[in-house]
Amino acid sequence: MSTTSSKVAIKPLEDRIVVQPLDAEQTTASGLVIPDTAKEKPQEGVVLAVGPGRFENGERLPLDVKTGDVVLYSKYGGTEVKYNGEEYLVLSARDVLAIVEK
């Protein structure tokens, strides 16, 4: 079972995970710089911490993701959190769409 282990002092509960979004491309192919206000929200990030899983029928269900995985997640899923000057995303495991294979 994957349990919480993190590089960050945020410990997610139940089936939640803490993700650090990867920076989206900052310039276009032709070299134009895209301002922050026009950027798409990233949908890819690195898992920094994993909760212990949720209970169902008295048993804890393990999560499919683990710390260090690069995941694709729902565009509008999760809650943005700023902690110690860093921005993180706290997602429910159901908001994770896929794990990116290395």
Swiss-Prot record:
Subcellular location: Cytoplasm
A biological process from GO: chaperone cofactor-dependent protein refolding
Name of a matching Pfam family: Cpn10
Signal peptide: none
HAMAP family linked: CH10
PANTHER family per UniProt: 10 KDA HEAT SHOCK PROTEIN (PTHR10772), CO-CHAPERONIN GROES (PTHR10772:SF58)
Name of the protein in question: Co-chaperonin GroES
Gene: groES
